[in-house]
Amino acid sequence: MKKDTHPDYHFITVQMNDGSTYKTRSTYGSEGDTLVLDIDPTTHPAWTGGGQQILDRGGRVSRFKKKFGFIGS
């Protein structure tokens, strides 16, 4: 492989919503950083049967519904 063409690949810690953590390799951040997930397999509707609502932390869903709410009606 060519030098300096690929991002640094290192170990990080991933923290799920329930507080559990695991280590994996990633290009995210730098060695030893922690990635805190907003939505993970324990809370995502695709894996939980769709009973839970997705948390709208950034207001994106609200803005979308406000702008395009008439589409699904």
From Swiss-Prot:
Assigned keywords, A-Z:
Ribonucleoprotein, Ribosomal protein, RNA-binding, rRNA-binding
Any GO molecular function: rRNA binding
For the biological process aspect of GO, one term held by this record is:
translation
Matching entries from Pfam families are given as: Ribosomal_L31
Recorded GO cellular component terms are: ribonucleoprotein complex; ribosome
**Gene3D superfamilies in the cross-refs:** Ribosomal protein L31
Asked if the keyword Electron transport belongs to this entry, the reply reads no
Q: What does this protein do?
A: Binds the 23S rRNA.
Q: What does the subunit section of this Swiss-Prot or TrEMBL entry state?
A: Part of the 50S ribosomal subunit.
What the record says about family reads: Belongs to the bacterial ribosomal protein bL31 family. Type A subfamily.
The record's annotation in NCBIfam families points to:
L31 (TIGR00105), PRK00528.1 (NF001809)
Instruction: Identify this protein by name.
Output: Large ribosomal subunit protein bL31
Query: Per the UniProt entry, what species is this protein from, by scientific name?
Result: Parvibaculum lavamentivorans (strain DS-1 / DSM 13023 / NCIMB 13966)
Q: Which gene encodes it?
A: rpmE
